[in-house]
Amino acid sequence: MAMVETTGRDSKFIGNFTLTDIGEVDVITETGIIPSVKFKIKFDNGSISEDTTLPLEELGKLDWYSLHPHLKLCQKLPTAQQNLMNLIRSALPNSPKQTQYQVKRLGTHTIDGEPVYNTGGDLIRCSPITKNCTNILLVSQGYNLDIDQTLNESEAAAEMMKIVSLCPDVGRVIFSHLLLYIMRKAYKDAVIAPCCSLFLYGGSGQFKTTYSTFLTQIHNRSKGILRPDRLNSSIPGATELIYKKSDCVVVLDDLCPRDSKKTMAQQEETLLEIARIIADGTRPAKFRGHTVPRKEPPSCGVLFTGEYLIGTGSDAARLLPIRLTTPIDKVKLSECQAKPLVVSTFFHYYIKWYIEKYSTIQDLLRKWWEKYTKTDLGVHRRLQETHFFLNTANKIFLQYCMENGLTSPEKASVHHQSFENLLNCLVQAQDVRVKQGIKSNPNNVDFFDVLCALYKNGDFHVAKNRKRFNSSSSKYDGLIHNELLC
């Protein structure tokens, strides 16, 4: 069977195939509608290819040899391109027009009313009972959510919690930040888009970067954990990096003392500018000294790492610092690193649940947001929003655990209260820096003022004597001894 071009009484062979199922398609993308065509290739031996879909304007430039290794042309490529384009165009008026949604960006999409999640190599959709029959084309971007098939859902969750518990306070905050940005679109459509950044800081050699990158990378983990991008890149370079990412957390490393004051100043400037972009949804105009608004803010979160704090006033309000006080146990970290697919496997299960419960999650977010708007934590507005984002992401995770029998309501309640108390301490301590404009070096922080703020808000409890402090039921954080706070 051969493709034939008919011109008057003359017929010419074009190749060793014919085209079938030719049709016109409106391909709907995030930026608009692309008029396109689709067809299948049927070879002389009877085999038929998968659908080929491409923009109508690219039809005359198509490299036909790239479509299939067995395809042969009997004409020179430019001539064949023209003849095949004419043949396809002539068939379009007699074929029904179809609609196809093209999914390219990683993360959550709402298509024809149905939430779907692009993992890179697959689409996670609702169960067959609730999903619609929308035609969706997945455009591969070289990413994949690698899964350990030997881990069931409860095992994956248990192993994930081992990673988080390597550094309980830091781990829980980073984990909730990652959950938040995986569910970014649900937040954006229901209440408000996430716009908060974390800053993990502590001394050198504490495995800050190793831990944070291992915990936050969800794609291509079978190929190894990638080294994070560094803060010594230019502001335009770092800006382009975060605008290429979506529904994930980007780690930017490493703010530390340098011999060169110029280098330190440049890194600090980059960190603060990226924090502004995440919080405000603006990006800098290249080298013009001002910012220009984007139609959309970045769709990823950022986790900075460093050895000292920076930022005062409104800059401090855009960051939530978490201090790593002791090095992460190297042996336990190595044990977790030996199972790199735990994180991506856990999120495979979690995202399936998230997509299935998408509308329920949005309803919960609306209810919680209404309560938050009537609550005053006594901190800067941005810090209160950060508290909302991280606290509710953790609550949704606990809901997932309860629905799947991974924890009891009683344990979930204890976990929630503990995490909320942790967030209270973090945002209140940072609010002191916001209000007082404390210098960024941690050696200059007035921790007495921080403790006063925590005590005033009921998050720091002081015992009046050693007996109370040492009692088995003690819930005190410090004690007054010889007129000193210990």
Where are these regions (language model features)?
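AAA+/P-loop NTPase substrate/partner-engagement loops
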Residues: 201, 210-264
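Conserved catalytic/switch belt of AAA+ P-loop NTPases
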Residues: 267-287
